[in-house]
Regions:
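N-terminal intrinsically disordered/low-complexity leader segments
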Residues: 1-27
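Helix-turn-helix
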Residues: 2, 31, 39-73, 77
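An amphipathic alpha-helix adjacent to DNA-recognition modules
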Residues: 26-34, 46-47, 67-91, 140
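Short helix-capping/turn signature of helix-turn-helix
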Residues: 68, 126-131
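Hydrophobic alpha-helical connector segments
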Residues: 77, 91-122, 168-175
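Amphipathic alpha-helical packing segments from all-alpha helical-bundle domains
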Residues: 84-91, 116, 133-159, 170
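Hydrophobic/aromatic-rich alpha-helical bundle segments in the mid-to-C-terminal region
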Residues: 123-126, 136-140, 155-195
């Protein structure tokens, strides 16, 4: 074997130029998603425009189309990022987990998210109140499977005597309702708390 054959080939995707392009892509996508989230909250899905999102992101409209193709794809990306962030608190939940620790962490995480970024909750609420036209399929498949998986773990906890909850779905709904209330009705909550 020659010395040249022994050398590892450098992949085109592992060059400094490619890594730089990936970093720019990630940065642009993050800028666009943040701008889109703001625009959708302020203007609604119907009122938001790709130009408005581009202006808010400080990027050319062509970049927004390059990364997300159209408004619907961008809106779905924003909604999915919201759901993904919310559900992170229960990702590592297993039958061997301590229910008190898991549920407490989930509630604290959800409350923190509601206080830090209430607009995300408002955007999701607007979508759901409107009949979830963009999320209906996602909610009836991916989200439903996720909830079912978490409910199964909670049922196992109940069988093991770790929790007294017999209907885990109702517990999840109660946690969502309670934590999201702080964001969706921020004006009311702040007024009641004299803040």
């Amino acid at each position: 074997m020659t010395q040249n054959n022994q050398k590892e080939e450098t992949s085109v995707t592992d060059t400094p130029s490619h890594r730089s392009q990936q970093a720019i892509r990630a940065q642009n996508q993050a800028l666009i998603l943040a701008a889109a989230e703001e625009e959708f909250v302020l203007q609604s899905y119907r009122g938001a425009t790709m130009q408005g999102i581009a202006d808010r992101a400080g990027l050319p409209k062509a970049n927004v189309h390059y990364y997300f193709k159209n408004k619907k794809n961008l809106y779905m990306a924003v909604l999915r990022s919201i759901i993904q962030e919310w559900n992170e608190g229960l990702v590592t939940m297993t039958v061997d987990s301590d229910p008190k620790t898991v549920i407490e962490k989930f509630v604290r995480t959800k409350l923190h998210q509601a206080f830090v970024n209430p607009s995300r909750h408002k955007l999701f609420a607007i979508e759901v109140i409107g009949g979830a036209p963009h999320l209906h399929e996602f909610m009836s498949t991916t989200m439903k499977e996720w909830v079912h998986d978490k409910a199964q773990v909670m049922k196992e906890w109940h069988k093991q005597g770790k929790i007294g909850i017999t209907d885990p779905l109702q517990l999840l709904i109660l946690i969502w309702a309670t934590t999201q209330r702080y964001a969706e009705f921020e004006i009311e909550i702040v007024g009641l708390m004299d803040k």
